[in-house]
């Protein structure tokens, strides 16, 4: 298997890797896959190529750790309320399975917000929405939607804490800095690399007038 990464400290932005029409990515988001030696598309498990199929949508400025997995294709034909969870329908070449019903159910798009950090070998289940600014801990199993700026971890993943207080989170969601033009982002970089949300908000307000 080809290793797409020359160093564990250097990720490759997703826009230089992604080819699937059902994998949508924003700007600057990267996958740091050195230790698993595969492309990001290998992280999107069972991603169907069909038009109208569930999509994996990833925002801008996301950091995705090596070996993270996004489980796609809904229930993949497994119905736990049926007598058997086996997907007979998808083996039409077997004569005994000829009259099997199609158990596939879509889960809807999996949506990862902007500025999300996903730890190594975390697993995101189908149809999940991860809010802007969230952090997913290493090897977390995410089975429910994650609120913006929440830090979650564990199996199943639970909220550990919020990155900021509610007022600061509201300001960040109002500013949506990930959509700023390059000139504004450059001017704000000293504040972006600090924890002073109020100062960043003042900068944004003055720059927007």
From Swiss-Prot:
> CDD domains in the record, alphabetically?
LbH_XAT (cd03349)
Domain of life (superkingdom): Bacteria
Active site located where? 78
Give its E.C. classification number.
Answer: 2.3.1.28
Q: Can you cite a GO biological process for this protein?
A: response to antibiotic
Coiled-coil residues: none
Instruction: Quote the catalytic activity from the record.
Output: chloramphenicol + acetyl-CoA = chloramphenicol 3-acetate + CoA
PROSITE patterns on file? HEXAPEP_TRANSFERASES
Keywords for this protein: Acyltransferase, Antibiotic resistance, Repeat, Transferase
- What's one Pfam family here? Hexapep
For this UniProt entry, the molecular function terms from Gene Ontology, in alphabetical order, are: chloramphenicol O-acetyltransferase activity
* Function in brief: This enzyme is an effector of chloramphenicol resistance in bacteria.
**Matching NCBIfam families:** chloram_CatB
The family classification in the record reads: Belongs to the transferase hexapeptide repeat family.
PANTHER family (UniProt xref): ACETYLTRANSFERASE, CHLORAMPHENICOL ACETYLTRANSFERASE
Q: What is this protein called?
A: Chloramphenicol acetyltransferase
Quote the gene name from the UniProt entry: cat
């Amino acid at each position: 298997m080809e290793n797409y990464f020359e160093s564990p400290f250097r990720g490759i932005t997703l826009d230089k890797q992604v080819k699937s029409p059902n994998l949508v990515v924003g700007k600057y988001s990267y996958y740091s896959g050195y230790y698993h030696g595969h492309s990001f598309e290998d992280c999107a498990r069972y991603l169907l190529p069909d038009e109208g199929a569930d999509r994996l949508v990833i925002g801008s400025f996301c950091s995705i750790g090596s070996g993270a997995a996004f489980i796609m294709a809904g229930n993949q034909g497994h119905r736990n309320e049926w007598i058997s969870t086996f997907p007979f329908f998808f083996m039409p070449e077997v004569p005994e399975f000829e009259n099997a019903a199609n158990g596939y159910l879509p889960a809807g798009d999996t949506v990862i917000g902007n500025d999300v950090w996903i730890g190594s070998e975390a697993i995101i289940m189908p149809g999940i929405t991860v809010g802007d600014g969230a952090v997913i801990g290493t090897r977390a199993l995410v089975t429910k939607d994650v609120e913006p700026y929440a830090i979650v971890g564990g199996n199943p993943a639970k909220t550990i804490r919020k990155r900021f207080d509610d007022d600061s989170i509201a300001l960040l969601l109002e500013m949506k800095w990930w959509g700023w033009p390059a000139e504004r982002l450059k001017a704000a970089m000293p504040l972006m690399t600090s924890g002073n949300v109020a100062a960043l908000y003042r900068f944004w307000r003055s720059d927007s007038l």
